[in-house]
């Protein structure tokens, strides 16, 4: 895959140098319509705040079916680990408390996305629980000439795992779930399993992708499965790929199994449990992709003929949200760590535990920026932490940065071609927005 070098040009936009002449960006600047809001800081709603109001929108037509399987981006592959008890990431970068230039930020993001062929993109920036800036670019539905707005919802793919992990950690705090006990027993399953080792897999191992549970895409996109619950149950009948706790392999199946546990313990449907426990207390709204159709207000996306793959991913990658919704969740986790009295979703000890990295496999080339994984969080190696997500025509990222900023960028389209590039785009956009 060709690598991109991102630099800010004299006009404050992104210039792209490709390592291979075989890759290029398509599209024109005509798509870069921008809707933004960064005039005054807005305090994040707490538990008593009303939910975000979505404006009425026209139901977009069905998308042209894709002829390819949806692809999910996995941070890494299987590798033997030596320890999962290292300390959480710490930083010494001073917090940024100066002005934030939303227009400069937008210029960088738009140049890297919709100006090069993406359908739409949205961003949100927060600091210490306050909204600094939100913006949207491009078209929510180009076939209907519907522009994207700050209320447009995007498929957030594996960023969904952060929501699932947060709810699980709440239940660990409450004593309803034991982090280091087998999940099967807590789910009321006593076997027999196709692989007896399944009965020993702990909740922590599911959260950290060290369970050995299969990562096969066939679990989700084969066998005529229609729901994530079916995918999870199907996985229980598979042989583990390694002894639990001895290796790391990123697997969506882990989080579908956690979804089953969440439903069992709370007595609520998974979507309801996430809304009540994670989203509503911080004034965020989102929905789990429920049908083959795109809802009004959702960004247009590619589809796979005859398959509702978002529904099958569920707790692992099925949420649809605005950039601000995603930023609010990450910001609440950060507040729980740095200002426990202001935390609204989990205790500081839980966030600290979520940020303890498991060793990342040695790859060629090595993982970008020394990335590693915790409990439902990606640790980016520079002190930033959050999560990324990539699936058919969708790129998503939310990052809690060492400078105190929380940034989310959600993209519908194929540019950049991976979330590694979005990390660089965020760095450049923040640099432009905070330049003296």
What function would you assign to each model-found segment?
Residues 1-148, 170-177, 208, 264, ...:
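N-terminal leader/targeting segments and the immediately adjacent pre-domain N-terminus
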Residues 2, 16, 21-27, 93-135, ...:
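Catalytic loop of the DD-peptidase/beta-lactamase superfamily, centered on the K-T-G motif
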Residues 101, 105, 156, 160, ...:
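Hydrophobic (often cysteine-bearing) scaffold residues that line and stabilize catalytic clefts
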Residues 109, 123, 129, 161-164, ...:
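Residue-level preference for non-acidic, small/hydrophobic
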Residues 116-122, 143-205, 242-251, 314:
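Short active-site loop at a secondary-structure junction
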Residues 125-127, 187, 291:
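A general secondary-structure junction signal
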Residues 134, 141, 194-390, 397:
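Short, surface-exposed loop or secondary-structure junction motifs
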Residues 138, 149, 184, 355, ...:
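Residue-level detector of conserved, well-ordered beta-strand and adjacent loop positions
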């Amino acid at each position: 895959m060709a690598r991109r070098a991102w630099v800010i040009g004299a006009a404050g936009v992104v210039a792209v140098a490709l390592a291979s002449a075989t890759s290029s960006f398509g599209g024109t600047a005509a798509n870069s319509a921008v809707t933004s809001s960064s005039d005054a800081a807005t305090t994040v709603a707490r538990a008593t705040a009303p939910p975000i109001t979505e404006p009425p929108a026209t139901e977009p037509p069905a998308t042209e079916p894709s002829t390819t399987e949806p692809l999910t981006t996995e941070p890494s592959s299987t590798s033997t680990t030596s320890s999962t008890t290292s300390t959480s990431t710490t930083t010494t970068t001073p917090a940024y408390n100066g002005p934030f230039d939303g227009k400069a930020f937008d210029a960088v993001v738009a140049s890297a996305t919709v100006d090069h062929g993406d359908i739409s993109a949205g961003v949100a920036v927060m600091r210490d629980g306050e909204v600094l800036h939100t913006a949207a670019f491009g078209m929510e539905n180009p076939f209907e000439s519907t522009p994207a707005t700050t209320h447009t919802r995007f498929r957030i793919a594996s960023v969904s795992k952060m929501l699932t992990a947060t709810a699980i950690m709440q239940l660990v705090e409450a004593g309803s779930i034991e982090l280091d006990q087998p999940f099967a027993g807590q789910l009321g399953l006593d076997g027999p399993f196709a692989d007896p080792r399944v009965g020993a897999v702990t909740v922590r191992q599911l959260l950290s992708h060290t369970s050995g549970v299969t990562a096969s895409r066939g679990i989700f996109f084969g066998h005529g499965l229609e729901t994530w619950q079916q995918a999870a149950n199907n996985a229980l009948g598979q042989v583990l790929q390694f002894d639990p706790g001895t290796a790391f392999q990123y697997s969506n199946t882990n989080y579908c199994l956690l979804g089953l546990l969440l439903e069992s313990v709370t007595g609520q449907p998974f979507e309801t449990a996430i809304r009540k426990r994670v989203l509503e207390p911080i004034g965020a709204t989102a929905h789990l992709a429920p049908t083959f159709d795109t809802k009004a207000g959702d960004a247009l996306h590619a589809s796979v003929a005859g398959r509702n793959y978002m529904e099958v991913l569920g707790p692992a990658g099925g949420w649809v949200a605005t950039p601000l919704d995603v930023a609010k969740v990450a910001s609440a986790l950060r507040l729980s760590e740095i200002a426990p009295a202001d935390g609204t979703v989990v205790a500081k000890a839980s966030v600290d535990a979520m940020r303890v990295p498991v060793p990342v496999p040695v790859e060629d080339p090595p993982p970008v920026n020394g990335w590693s994984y915790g409990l439902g969080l990606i640790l980016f190696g520079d002190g930033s932490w959050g999560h990324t997500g990539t699936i058919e025509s969708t790129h998503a990222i939310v990052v809690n940065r060492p400078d105190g900023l929380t940034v989310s960028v959600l993209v519908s389209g194929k540019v950049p071609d991976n979330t590694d590039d979005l990390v660089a785009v965020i760095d450049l956009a923040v640099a432009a927005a905070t330049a003296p």
